[in-house]
């Protein structure tokens, strides 16, 4: 995978919020996901596009 393709634009990260909680997201570069700690969900990034659908998000387990 191209390393540059997996990076998230910091300006985009400032604008995006969790669709469930409207809270901030953090980027997990290892999993290539946007994480909502409050909702305990991780939204995938596919081909450089964040998939901001709760139905597509992975539940974060402890």
Curated annotation (Swiss-Prot):
Gene source species: Rhizobium meliloti (strain 1021)
Name of protein: UPF0434 protein R03186
An example Gene Ontology CC term for this record: cytosol
Gene3D superfamilies in UniProt: 2.20.25.10
Family membership: Belongs to the UPF0434 family.
Domain of life: Bacteria
Pfam families, sorted: Trm112p
